[in-house]
Regions:
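Alpha-helix initiation/capping motif
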Residues: 16, 57, 68-71, 104, ...
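Alpha-helical and coiled-coil interaction segments, frequently adjacent to or embedded
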Residues: 162-251
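Generic secondary-structure transition motif, activating predominantly at the C-termini of alpha-helices
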Residues: 10, 14, 27-31, 44-48, ...
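Active-site acidic/histidine clusters and adjacent loop/turn architecture
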Residues: 65, 71-76
Length: 251
């Protein structure tokens, strides 16, 4: 289809053979839109692993089994579009909970410097699928293990990351059919000037996954862990905006 939210966009081709094959396997046009979107969400969230690398197409992400949040969101969106379900990107400038910051940012001096100086320009995103007349959110970036390592609930289809581990800066939430062209530039630049920094973040992510596995096992499985985490509620960071517009996290 060439209709808005169904057609191919940058890095997100719902007509790619890999996408069509997977969409069929997940029950495209057999399940209800809601059931299919949930199946696509579960697949992308739990079967693909976060890895910081330059942006490329959904076909490459599926072959590799890894990608950044935006790679994974693009796979979710492509699967929905392949199944005839309208899907779009939701983007926002954000700051993150301390546990996420420790794993993703604090492990490398260059990444930390970059994040702290860019502050407002850290863009994060989620997918949204149009189900039964309303847009439903899908945050596919973190596996259950990474969420457990951060001490937060295991989010389900329709649950927002905002307010749980990301906090959107007011007035920055945007909805888009496509990833903007400039979005992939930061990771391309980082790979060029400091491949070691990327590697350090990726090693830290893998350690976080291992830690989360243990936490889930000790809790007695994903459901038991999730119940416990929901009872506790999210631990909000104290965010202090300083003169330079840097975001400073305080314990």
């Amino acid at each position: 289809s060439n209709e808005k939210y169904l057609r191919p966009t940058l890095y997100c081709n719902p007509r790619a053979p890999e996408v069509i094959a997977l969409a069929n396997e997940l029950g495209a046009f057999e399940k209800s839109d809601r059931e299919f979107a949930e199946a696509a969400f579960e697949f992308v969230k739990e079967k693909l692993t976060l890895e910081i690398l330059p942006m490329d197409g959904v076909e490459a992400t599926l072959r590799r089994g890894t990608g950044t949040c935006f790679h994974l969101i693009s796979v979710f969106i492509a699967l929905c579009r392949a199944a005839g379900i309208k899907a779009r990107y939701k983007m926002f400038a954000m700051n993150m909970i301390q546990a996420w910051y420790n794993t993703m940012i604090d492990v490398d001096p260059l990444v930390k410097k970059w994040y702290d100086s860019m502050g407002y320009f850290m863009i994060e995103g989620e997918g949204e699928a149009y189900i039964d007349g309303k847009w439903m959110v899908a945050h596919v970036g973190p596996t259950a293990e990474r969420q457990a390592a951060a001490g937060i609930p295991i989010t389900k289809f329709g649950e927002d990351s905002l307010g749980i581990w990301y906090f959107a800066l007011p007035g920055t939430v945007m909805h888009m059919e496509s990833i903007p062209y400039g979005l992939g530039q930061a990771t391309k630049l980082l790979k060029k000037i400091a491949p070691g920094s990327m590697e350090r973040v990726n090693i830290s992510i893998l350690k976080q996954i291992e830690m989360g596995k243990k936490i889930i096992e000790e809790a007695g499985g994903k459901e038991a862990y999730d119940e416990m985490a929901r009872r506790k509620g999210p631990k909000m960071p104290k965010v202090k905006l300083e003169e330079k517009k840097e975001i400073v996290f305080e314990e």
